[in-house]
Amino acid sequence: LTLLTLAALWNANNAQARPRSLQELAAINGKLIETGVKYGSIPSLYRPRYDRIQDANLSLSDDEVVFIAMLQGGARVYPQRIMVWHQVVNEIVDDKAYAITYCPTTGTFMAYDSSMGGLNLIFDTEGRLYDANSVLIDRNSGSLWLQETGMAFDGPLLGRGLPMVPVYWTTWGAAKRTFPHALVLAKPNGNKPYGRDPYGNYLRKGTYYDNDRLIY
């Protein structure tokens, strides 16, 4: 399979999340689902290390799911095996801030320009869900955001939207052929079992990703 058949590309170089009415935003805030996951239990990453393609190739297999974000300066690759444990990567490239986000329960990978009003917003996973999608929280203002739209629905930044960054969903084999000079998110230090997905496996039948049942 080629990158074009596997990738979901957001043509959103200058796109921004569509505003909602205050009534719609209030409805979101009233329908959040408690998951038992507390704020801080899923640690986000801040300006993590990256490997070159040839170094990352030693630990990634060609059929593994990876995500690509087109940041300033070029493509960056984010292995799903790492993103599932952290869900948010806060990055700064040439003084430009980005939030690289992944929600395993909806299977959405989104990247945003997170510079706003002179601030570089830093995001974490808040722990609750809306319609199975992760709720994000920024450390700067404490506002709550939808992961799949980049829209603030509660807090001082209510109604604000983050510009989207183009992303791809593909495999490691396709990614390294198409972007041979990309930087690849390196395995963080720590004892998390990065080779194991707590939600299942995209390549194996009968796991979470092959199940239409509502989990939350």
Give, region by region, the residue ranges found by the protein language model.
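Bacterial N-terminal signal peptides
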Residues: L1-A8
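N-terminal signal peptide c-region/cleavage motif recognized by signal peptidases
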Residues: W10-A12
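Mid-to-C-terminal functional-domain signal that highlights helix-capping/loop sites
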Residues: A15-Y216
